[in-house]
Amino acid sequence: RIISAVNDYHFIWEGRVHRVGASAGITLIDDNNHQAAEVMSQADIACYASKNGGRGRVTVYEPQQAAAHSERAAMSLDEQWRMIKENQLMMMAHGVASPRIPEARNLWLISLKLWSCEGEIIDEQTFRRSFSDPALSHAFDRRVFHEFFQQAAKAVASKGISIALPLSVAGLSSATLVNDLLEQLENSPLPPRLLHLIIPAEAILDHAESVQKLRLAGCRIILSQVGRDLQIFNSLKANMADYLLLDGELCANVQGNLMDEMLITIIQGHAQRLGMKTIAGPVVLPLVMDTLSGIGVDLIYGDVIADAQPLDLLVNSSYFAIN
C-alpha cells in the first residue's frame, strides 16, 4: 500500500506533473536471521533487485539474489578505470560542529559518490574495495584532488570554511602524489589550514614522514577508523595529527551501550593527552549527541548537525564562516 500510495502521488513542479516512484526490499527477521549487518545487507540486495526490475516494485530477499548481486558488483578493470577517468563524481559535504554548540559549523567532511557505467550510484568505500590494481587508488585520489582544486577550492577559500578530503593509504605512500597535492595547494587561493586530509589511522605507522610533510605544509590531519583496537595509541605521539575520527559503529548506540561509552571515554582521554580533537558520527539522534557531549567528545557530524549536501551547493550558498 505504501508503494502504491507513492506511485499514485502527483508531484507538480512549475506547472508540470511529474511521476514519483518507489521501490522496496524486504527480508525476514527471526531467530536464525537477526544480525543487524546481515539483515541490512539482505534488505539492500532485495531493494537493488526491485530497482533493477523497474518502478514501483517490492522484492522479498532470496539467497540466490546475493549471488546475482555479487556478479553485478564485480567490475572489470577497464570499467574501474573508465569510472575514475570519465564518470561523474559527486562530493557530499557533512557539517561538523561541537555537540555543545551544534549551530556553529565551519568544518565539512567530504564523502564521495560515483556513477557506474550502468547509472548506479556507488559510494567511495564500496568502489575502493572493488579495486583489483593498486594503481587505481592513486588514480582515484588524483581525480578527487584535481576536481577539488579546479572546481571548488576558490569558492571554499572565499567562504572561509574548512574542508576534509579523504586520502587513501596507497595515495599517501606515493611521494609523487603527495608532492602533486602540495603543488596544487600552493598554486590555489586556498589557505593550507583550511584543507584537512582524512587518513586511515593505520597509515600513520608506515607513512609518518609523508603525514608530517603535509602537516608542515599547513594541512590538518584527521586520522580515521579509530575504534576498538586501542593499540594505535601505543604508537601515536603529540603533533602527529590534529583530529581522531571515531568509527561510526562505535557511537551508533552509545546512549545504551556501556562498553561503547567506556571505549569512547578512553579514546577521548588519549586524544586530550596527545593534544588532538575527537570527531564522532554520523549522529542522527539528539540523545546520542547528548551522550557524546557528556563524554567530552569535541565534534560530531550527522543529520542532528546538518543534512549532507553537494559541495558545490554549499559553496554557492549564502553561508560563510570566520575561520
Regions found by a protein language model. Give the residues of each.
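Alpha-helical scaffold within the catalytic cores of cyclic-nucleotide enzymes
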Residues: R1-W13, Q42-D44, V144-K154
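Regulatory helix in c-di-GMP signaling enzymes, encompassing the GGDEF I-site helix
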Residues: I2, A24, V39-S50, V58, ...
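Catalytic core regions of nucleotide second-messenger enzymes
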Residues: V6-A22, K51, E120, V156-I161
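EAL-family c-di-GMP phosphodiesterase catalytic domain
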Residues: N7, R16, H94, K113-E120, ...
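Catalytic-core segments of nucleotide cyclases and related cyclic-nucleotide turnover enzymes
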Residues: E14, I29-R55, Q125, V226, ...
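C-di-GMP signaling machinery
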Residues: D30, I45, A49-A93, E124, ...
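Catalytic core of bacterial c-di-GMP phosphodiesterases, primarily the EAL and HD-GYP domains
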Residues: V58, W108, L136-E209, P282
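Active-site core of bacterial EAL-family cyclic-dinucleotide phosphodiesterase domains
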Residues: R72-S130, P166, Y301, A306-P310
